[in-house]
């Protein structure tokens, strides 16, 4: 069998359902040192970002007693909040450019939405701003890897940032901040799984 390029191997891996990935490792990709280094470095980076999001979720819980989504089932955030899709990262019609672009677009969107969390938790300004910087840096890392793999990239310039969402009242702001963090955590978990499965090849 001829060796797979990193792009083709990436497409085959992420094109399979998550359950199938454990049974069909592609050893061909393991020899690409730079690609594996990228994966391991950014797995650690993503884990660090997830930890920071969890710390802010605990702050929302401690400050506003908003701790679980079950408690807020009947409360709809106002306005509708970002829920960035990552469906292209684990479907059979996978395209590497689309998966990585979805991750980058989601990081871009959540970076902007975190402005609402910044207003909600002024005592945690440093952590929120660090989280925004880390999201931007992770997006930049992925863009660089896309370029290294010869994938098409979409430029997401900082000057085109969207303003953070605004809310109709204090309680809606608290609920909105809660769901921004919860949605971001789910997004990061999915992105983390994609990188982790690739790193296990």
Swiss-Prot record:
One of its GO terms (biological process) is positive regulation of cell population proliferation. Glycans are attached at residues 123, 137. GO terms for cellular component: extracellular space. GO terms for molecular function: cytokine activity; granulocyte colony-stimulating factor receptor binding; growth factor activity. Pfam families: GCSF (PF16647). Disulfide bonds join 61-67, 89-99. Residues 1-23 form the signal peptide. Keywords: Disulfide bond, Glycoprotein, Growth factor, Secreted, Signal. Hematopoietic growth factor that stimulates the proliferation and colony formation of normal and transformed avian cells of the myeloid lineage. Belongs to the IL-6 superfamily. This is Myelomonocytic growth factor. It comes from Gallus gallus.
